[in-house]
Structure formats: structure tokens, C-alpha cells
């Protein structure tokens, strides 16, 4: 039953009347909408989508993301101008990857360890269950990393990216990308470091 309130000369209603119309206040306006009863939530498509979401959330929790990785995911979410947290962006990109028939055994790069930057170089090591050689993309802007650096086998972790020819006293942003055999990619968050003064 709807609750009707009548101050001086205005009327407002909220809740549902007769299981058909719903009255509410939305963005400062009194609105009425048809009550929608959700469709069967157990269709094959919905169960598949929920399975993909569950797999993405499970991967987030078992991947062993460090504080540096989590900060990078949040930085990426901020730089992408989406109203998402790093967690939500991770889950979204993983689900999109799986929908594109990506290899579920390929994981996004993680556990990044940024070496001590010199005035013109920096080496980053990371783990990534990648079928193909990962790449790193680096730039001086949060929103544009256009320089591609091919990664090599790492010394202590699985892979490493050696950034050279950098400018002194400059903040760089980079992300890492792992690939499956069909060239579907999984990217990391947006990491950062500042080179030393010359």
C-alpha cells in the first residue's frame, strides 16, 4: 500500500500500488513507473554470465595481487575516466576477455616489482601466465602510453621489462600486457615510477 504524505499544497507518494505501479522520488522529482518483474534468472545465458563473473572474482582473490598492483588498478580506473574502482575494472576486463574466448589459463600481469630507477633506465619484473611474450607500454602521461617495450625472461620473476633511454627527473606511467595464442590480451593496472636526477 502506498504511503501518501500531504504537506501544505503538495502531495507525494512512495511504494507500490496494486503490484502494477511504483511511486518514488528520483533526482528531486516525483515519478511513477510500471513495476517490472524480473525474467527467469536461470536461463542458460544468465548462468553463463554469472559463471564468468564468478571466475573473474575468484581470480582477483587468488592472484596474489600486492599493494603496488592494487594501487596500479585504482590508478588505471582513475585514468580511464570511468566511474569504476580498480576491482570493478579488473572484473570487467576479465569477463570481456573470457567472452572473447580468451584462454582462461592466461592471467593478467601481476606481482610487479619496480627496480630502483636511474636517471635514464628502470627495470620491472613481474609474473604473468602468458602463452606469448608479454609487452610493456610506457609514457609520461596517465592517459597515453604509446612506447612499446618487448619483455624478456625475468631474473627473479617470470618476466622483466627493461625501460631505457628515459629522461631524468621524469615521472613515467606504464602497464603490462600478456597474450594468449589467439592474440587476446590481458592488461595490468597502471604503474608509475620517477627517474633519478642526472
Locate predicted features.
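Conserved aromatic anchor
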Residues: 120-132
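Long, polar/Ser/Thr-enriched low-complexity segments
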Residues: 1-109
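Extracellular low-complexity, O-glycosylation-prone stalks/linkers
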Residues: 130-149
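Short, solvent-exposed loop/linker segments at the N-terminal edge
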Residues: 114-118
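Short S/T/G- and acidic-enriched coil/turn segments that sit immediately N-terminal to beta-strands
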Residues: 156-162
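Beta-strand-rich modules
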Residues: 164-185
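An aromatic-rich alpha-helical recognition segment common to small helix-rich domains
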Residues: 60, 126, 136, 175-176
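Extracellular fibronectin type III
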Residues: 181-198
Amino acid at each position: 500500500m502506498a504511503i501518501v504524505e500531504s504537506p501544505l499544497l503538495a502531495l507525494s507518494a512512495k511504494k507500490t500500488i496494486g503490484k502494477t505501479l511504483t511511486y518514488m522520488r528520483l533526482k528531486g522529482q516525483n515519478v511513477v513507473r510500471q513495476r517490472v518483474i524480473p525474467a527467469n534468472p536461470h536461463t542458460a545465458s544468465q548462468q553463463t554470465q554469472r559463471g564468468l563473473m564468478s571466475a573473474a572474482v575468484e581470480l582477483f582473490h587468488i592472484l596474489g595481487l600486492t599493494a603496488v598492483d592494487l594501487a596500479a588498478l585504482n590508478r588505471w580506473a582513475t585514468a580511464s575516466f570511468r566511474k569504476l574502482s580498480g576491482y570493478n575494472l579488473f572484473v570487467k576486463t576479465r569477463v570481456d576477455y573470457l567472452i572473447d574466448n580468451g584462454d582462461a589459463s592466461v592471467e593478467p600481469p601481476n606481482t610487479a616489482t619496480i627496480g630502483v630507477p636511474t636517471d635514464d633506465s628502470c627495470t620491472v619484473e613481474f609474473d604473468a601466465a602468458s602463452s606469448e611474450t608479454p609487452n610493456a607500454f610506457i609514457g609520461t602521461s596517465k592517459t597515453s602510453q604509446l612506447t612499446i617495450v618487448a619483455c624478456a625472461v625475468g631474473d627473479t620473476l617470470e618476466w622483466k621489462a627493461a625501460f631505457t633511454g628515459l629522461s631524468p627527473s621524469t615521472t613515467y606511467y606504464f602497464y603490462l600486457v600478456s597474450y594468449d595464442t589467439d592474440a587476446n590480451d590481458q592488461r595490468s593496472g597502471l604503474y608509475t615510477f620517477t627517474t633519478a636526477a642526472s
